[in-house]
Structure formats: C-alpha cells, structure tokens
Design a protein with these regions (language model features):
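PLP-dependent enzyme catalytic core of the Aspartate aminotransferase-like
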Residues: 83, 91, 332, 341-350, ...
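A short helix->loop->beta-strand "cap" motif at the edges of active sites that frequently abuts
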Residues: 119, 140, 198-202, 226
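Active-site phosphate-binding strand-loop segment of PLP-dependent enzymes
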Residues: 148-216
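Conserved core segment of the aminotransferase class I/II
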Residues: 226-294, 304-306, 386-387
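N-terminal small-domain helix-loop-helix segment of the aminotransferase-like
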Residues: 2-102, 109, 280-283, 387-389
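Conserved PLP-anchoring active-site segment centered on the Schiff-base-forming lysine
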Residues: 113-135
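Conserved glycine-rich beta-strand-loop-beta hairpin in the small C-terminal domain of fold type I
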Residues: 278, 294-304, 315-328
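Short acidic capping loops at alpha-helix termini that bridge into adjacent secondary structure
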Residues: 92-97, 117-120, 226-227
Length: 389
C-alpha cells in the first residue's frame, strides 16, 4: 500500500528562493562545457586562507586536536579576540565572547536569545537574505525599514522613532552591509545605539565586514556602548569562508543565556578551525589581511568608474566589504532576466538584486569585486560587448 508523506513545516515553503542560484546553476553548466566563467556573484574573494593558518590547522590535527572543545570556544581563541579588540581601544572580556559556527551561527544564537515567537526585528531593506531567516527560525518576524540610496541604504534614528511599534523588540544592523558595502553613518549609529538603550530594545550589529573598511578605520559599534550584541567572523577578513568560524560578543546580561543556547544548539564550533584561527592574530597574518584589504580597495576604485561608464547607476562608493550595488534601470527592467542572459551569453556571473530587497525596483544588481583586476577588466569588456549587441 502507498504510504502518505507527512507534510513538512510551513516555514520551509515560506522561504523565498535564492534567485542567484539560477545564475549559479547556469555558470556551473557553462563551466562543465568548458566556458570561462568570471564569478562576480559570490561573496568570496579569490584569496586563499593565509599559509600560517593552514600550517596551524595541520599542526592541530597532527597533535590530535580533533575532539570537542568547550561550548564557548577555545579559551586561547577567545583571549586572542579580546586582545584584538583591545588593539582597537576596546575592553571586551573573553567571558563575553562566544565562538560560533560562522557568523550565521552567531546571528542565529543572537536571534534565539532575544526574539520570542510573534515578536518583530527591525531590519533595513535591502539586506542579506539569510538574516530574516534566522529571525523566522525562532518564531519571529521582520519589520522591514525601507531605506534609500541617499541614506546609504541604512536606517536612521528618526526612521526608528517614526516606524517602530510595540511588537518590535530587536534592531538588527549591518556595518558595513551586504549587498551595499555601506556602513552606518557615525552619528546615526550613535543615535540608534542610544535609542535601543532608551527604549529597552536589543541591538544586534553584524560587523563581519568592519575590518574591511576602505576610508580609514571604521570603528566598531562597541565604541558607542557595551550593552548589545556584535557579530564577527573569520570568513571575510581572514579568508576562511569554508572553515565556518565566527564569534558573538554578548552584553553581560546575555552571557549565561547564550552559553546555554550554544551548548544545546551547536555543542562547539569546529575544533580544527578554532586552532587554525589562533594564527590569524599573528602580526604577519594581520599584515597580510590588511594588504589584501588594500587590493580590494584598488579593485573597487578600478571597477566603479568603468561600470558607471557602461550605464550602471552607483549612487555612492561602498565604504567596505567587496560589493557594488548598482541600479541597472538604464540597461534593463528586470535584473533577474538580465543576469541570466548575461551569464549565458558572456560567462559573466552577477547577482540579481531581488535577492536582497522587497522594496526596490527589480533593476538592481550586486557585483562582487572578488576577482583580479585583469579578470574584472575582462568581465567589463564582455559586458560592454553584450550591451553593444
């Protein structure tokens, strides 16, 4: 007799598709046929993990460091992160640092600690598409804040005072943000930290791109207050995307709760990755990371004028990360169709902007400057030829 398949949870059906996956699938199919694909769709630079980090991982495995760690993370790694913050003028106790399975693990942990079923999280549109999923996974909902290019696609304290309601218990910021690369302006960040404190709301700030700032040192939100959550990661600045390692700085009031959640949700972050990450804070590795940041800045400065010349509207230079968020309305009415047709005809992979925004018109595109300048130049040449047809 046929068996009846039980229904899956409603949350699965409610998750919107990753539109870029159509581009990724097209790219894979083309590469399988031998086409040279230029990948400007994935948030992962072409840099490899630093050699000192690789050596530390090999040493850890050879020494048998493959078992569980404390759920909070290796004490030495938490101390190293604390010292890294101290080098920025911040006193962050290692007791307030939780090692996580990537920044995603940190965001999920922060959401689980702060959001009750039915409560809302204030979040800017556009946003990284996984962030609302963390909120929904713990039974919350997102209260979207529509932002504009003139506001650096970031919310403001005035917007919060105007839009927040009783159901909004958390504000989540990204500093700088994906897909825009724009940081929260300093005055607005200070005002929003104060607003959360004054109104009794939690604040979660995703700072995984904060070390990758191009216009001087971008200060952490922790300089403005210590009573909120900050997410960090080894993925972007230290080029450890596949190692799945991040951290969460917790306010004192949430340390015990987050540790309890981490014990039950994750057991621990990957042990070998933790031992490897200890090498990230050596002076030579930090110097290498900063040198790579300068390379990314050079790529940004090379790419944006050329994109503008092709007809892409880029309202402002990104402050950090490695993304350009461009309005292609002069070139297309549908960025999804544009990106799919572009990859098929040229082998240049870009990300349609509808993955990031419910409010913006469907003409925006995210372009990652994660390839060499020579490859970026080739991508631009192909796009120019495509537009000329």
């Amino acid at each position: 007799m046929p068996t009846q398949t039980p229904p899956l949870a409603l949350r699965v059906a409610e998750i919107p598709p990753f539109h870029v996956m159509q581009v990724v699938a097209e790219a894979a199919a083309l590469e399988a046929k031998g086409m040279d694909v230029i990948h400007l769709e994935v948030g992962e630079p072409d840099f490899s993990t630093p050699s000192d980090v690789l050596a530390a991982a090999q040493d850890a495995m050879a020494s048998g460091h493959t078992r569980y760690t404390d759920a909070r993370g290796l004490p030495a790694l938490r101390d190293a992160i604390s010292a890294w913050y101290a080098s920025q003028g911040l006193a962050i106790s290692a007791e307030r640092i939780q090692i996580t399975q990537g920044a995603s693990g940190a965001l999920l942990l922060a959401a689980a600690a702060t959001v009750n079923p039915g409560e809302q999280v204030l979040m800017a549109d556009p946003a990284y598409p996984c962030n609302p999923r963390f909120v929904e996974a713990v039974g919350g909902a997102v209260h979207w804040l529509r932002t504009e290019a003139t506001d650096a696609f970031q919310p403001s304290a005035a917007m919060l005072r105007r839009s927040a309601c009783a159901e909004d218990h958390v504000l989540m910021l990204a500093h700088p943000a994906n897909p825009t690369g724009m940081a929260v302006p300093a005055a607005e960040l200070r005002a929003m930290v104060s607003w959360c404190q004054d109104t009794g709301r939690h604040l979660i700030v995703d700072e995984i791109y904060q070390p990758l700032s191009f216009e001087g040192e971008l200060q952490s939100s922790l300089h403005l207050g210590q009573d909120h959550f900050v997410v960090g990661s080894f993925s972007k600045y230290f080029n450890m995307t596949g190692w799945r390692l991040g951290w969460l700085v917790m306010p004192e009031y949430a340390v015990s709760a987050c540790q309890k959640l981490a014990q039950h949700l994750f057991i621990c972050a990957p042990t070998t990755a933790q031992h490897a990450a200890l090498a990230c804070f050596r002076p030579d590795v930090l110097a290498e990371a900063d040198a790579r940041k300068e390379i990314l800045k050079s790529r940004r400065d090379f790419l944006i004028p050329r994109l503008r010349a092709l007809g892409f509207d880029i309202p402002m230079m990104p402050d950090g990360a490695f993304y350009v968020f461009a309005d292609a309305s002069a070139l297309t009415e549908n960025s999804q169709a544009f990106c799919v047709d572009l990859i098929r005809k040229t082998g240049v992979a870009l990300t349609p902007g509808n993955d990031f925004s419910q409010a913006l018109p469907p003409t925006w595109i995210r372009i990652a400057f994660t390839e060499t300048e020579a490859r970026l130049d080739e991508a631009l040449r192909r796009i120019e030829d495509y537009l000329a047809c």
